[in-house]
A protein has these predicted regions:
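Non-catalytic scaffold segments within catalytic domains of secreted glycoside hydrolases
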Residues: 1-61, 70-393
Length: 393
């Protein structure tokens, strides 16, 4: 059955600067992916902004994006590089001229090497440094932003980088997790105040990475409790003392073993379990409703779906997933939950962090030799939904 979303619902796509722009001087530069590629040239977005702007505008009236901190600011408290500022401003002006709602993300994983070398968010001294960066972001780009994320998936950044040791700086220390969490939550609150002082009417929040975490057997009880109570619960709480909405990403269900706690599964293991899956996780669209209801009950704030998608080369599966997820989201809205926006991850295939470019989420295909973008069938499907506010049968 076809379903209709309310007038004013926000449809768009989401990207991260580090995954689409050539690496400048951030801590992901030169990282080798699981499939052997080096994190350097990603999708040449900085050279193809005009073409990419047309793609973005074809996929809805909103765009969630970040900027490369390392390109903009070359040292702590330093002035922004004027040519980079102008480059970003021209792109933002193009989006605004087309009526695009811009959600500006101030921190999406990648940090300048100078920031990392000083200890990053393991040190309280990082807080004023980050606030200074955000103050300059407001000065140069605030007029273009329609809404803000202070941090993208801070829990994912913390756990992957300081507990599981999968992201830079590859640490595995729970006490460091707590220290980084404390500093990032304080930074969030300081930046929230800064943004609301400058633009009181523009909504501010984070994007929380979510999955459905369930133990694979009775032996996984501790991992399940830890993931739900600490990761989905306590960490999220720290960023919602000051927030105008709950932003959330969702990708599937993670079956938990006793140890080690794992965030990303493998197709081989998923196939052995006999569950439907993409290249990273179990396909579990009803789970987005579980998380939405949980956050609605816990925080009582409007909910924005800041990322949702499927990692696969099977585009028919991607189309199916968009339909399935939107039906679940619509059902939650029918129950009275205030959901304002849906940003699909992602507009075009990008460099999927430590996994590499072979892990594809895009509505457009990226040829990683020529960097040419070509639309997949899912692009037309999602574009029609965004244009009509209607999900077909």
């Amino acid at each position: 059955m076809a379903i209709r979303f309310p007038d004013g619902f926000i449809w768009g796509t989401s990207t991260a600067a580090a995954q689409i722009e050539t690496a400048f001087d951030h801590q992901w530069k030169g990282v080798q992916s699981r499939t052997g590629e080096y994190f350097q040239r990603t999708t040449d977005h900085e050279k193809r902004r005009g073409e990419d702007l047309e793609i973005i505008c074809s996929l809805g009236k909103a765009y969630r994006m970040s900027m490369d901190w390392s390109r903009l600011q070359r040292s702590a408290y330093g002035e922004f590089h004027p040519e980079v500022v102008q480059e970003y401003r021209e792109f933002l002006e193009g989006l605004k001229a087309r009526g695009i709602h811009i959600m500006l993300v101030l921190h999406h994983f990648a940090e300048p090497l100078w920031f990392t070398r000083e200890g990053g968010f393991t040190r309280a001294t990082a807080i004023p440094v980050f606030v200074d960066f955000c103050r300059k972001m407001v000065r140069y780009f605030g007029e273009y932003a329609s809404s803000w994320n202070t941090f993208n998936e801070p829990g994912g950044y913390i756990m992957m980088g300081y507990f599981l040791g999968i992201f830079p700086p590859y640490q595995k220390n729970f006490f460091t997790v707590l220290r980084v969490l404390g500093n990032m939550s304080k930074a969030h609150e300081a930046v929230y105040d800064l943004l609301k002082e400058a633009y009181p009417d523009k909504p501010v929040g984070i994007s929380k990475h979510t999955m459905v975490y369930e133990r694979e057997s009775a032996l996984g009880w501790f991992a399940e409790q830890f993931s739900n109570r600490f990761y989905l619960g306590y960490i999220t709480d720290q960023f919602h003392r000051k927030a105008d909405f709950v932003g959330m990403s969702y990708y599937g269900r993670v079956p938990l073993k006793p140890m080690p706690i794992s965030e990303i599964d493998t197709p081989g293991r998923l196939a052995k379990r006999g569950v439907r899956h993409d290249d990273m996780w179990e396909y579990y669209p009803q789970g987005i409703g579980t998380i939405i209801r949980r956050f609605h009950e816990r925080y009582g704030l409007p909910i924005w779906i800041t990322e949702n998608g499927l990692c696969t080369n099977d585009d028919a599966f991607r189309v199916e997933s968009i339909r399935d997820y939107l039906h679940v989201i619509h059902q939650c809205m029918e129950e009275g939950i205030d959901i304002r926006a849906y940003f699909h991850w992602t507009a075009w295939d990008n460099f999927e962090w430590f996994l590499g470019p072979q892990y594809r989420f895009g509505l457009y295909n990226t040829d990683f030799q020529t960097m040419e973008r070509t639309p997949k069938g899912s692009a037309a499907y999602f574009s029609a939904i965004a244009r009509t506010n209607r999900v077909p049968d």
